Design a protein with these regions (language model features):
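Charge-rich, intrinsically disordered N-terminal extensions
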Residues: 1-144
Length: 144
């Protein structure tokens, strides 16, 4: 068998495996934009958020983290997406920013935005840990 054919089929199997793992972790990922929706155009923005988050979710899966850790990161990413939509409605100026720019402005080396309605300090700290990880991942992607 030709080498390029072998790598192509291996890559396809790997992609299918990653897609299946992502489906197990986030069976409702396609519905996240609807769960965040306040206005009609929020679904499109939500889909953009999902496209930004998917590579990070795949990276988390490649790290072979414990199921509870993966679930926690997944839940925090869902919260972050909802917070992005909420903030766009609270501050119309944010609607002018591309979604990735807005996301990168909300997260930083220290963590993520304060969630509203308020969550406990320990919940916010856990959320911040996910945001720090996402921040590092997105910044590394910019330097590649």
């Amino acid at each position: 068998m030709h080498w390029s054919m072998m790598t192509s089929s291996t890559s396809t199997c790997q992609d299918n495996g990653e897609s299946a793992a992502l489906e197990r972790l986030c069976p409702d990922l396609a519905n996240w934009p609807l769960s965040w929706q306040v206005a009609k155009d929020d679904v499109i923005i939500g889909q953009c958020i999902i496209e930004i988050l998917k590579p990070f979710l795949h990276e988390l899966l490649r790290q072979h983290l414990a199921d509870r850790t993966l679930d926690r990161h997944r839940d925090h990413l869902w919260m972050l997406g909802g917070e992005i939509i909420r903030r766009r409605h609270d501050d119309p100026e944010l609607c002018k920013q591309p979604v990735k720019t807005l996301l990168l402005n909300l997260i930083e080396e220290e963590g993520g935005p304060l969630i509203w309605p308020r969550i406990s300090e320990s919940q916010q700290n856990a959320f911040d840990a996910t945001c720090r990880k996402l921040y590092r991942f997105l910044r590394q992607g910019e330097t590649r």
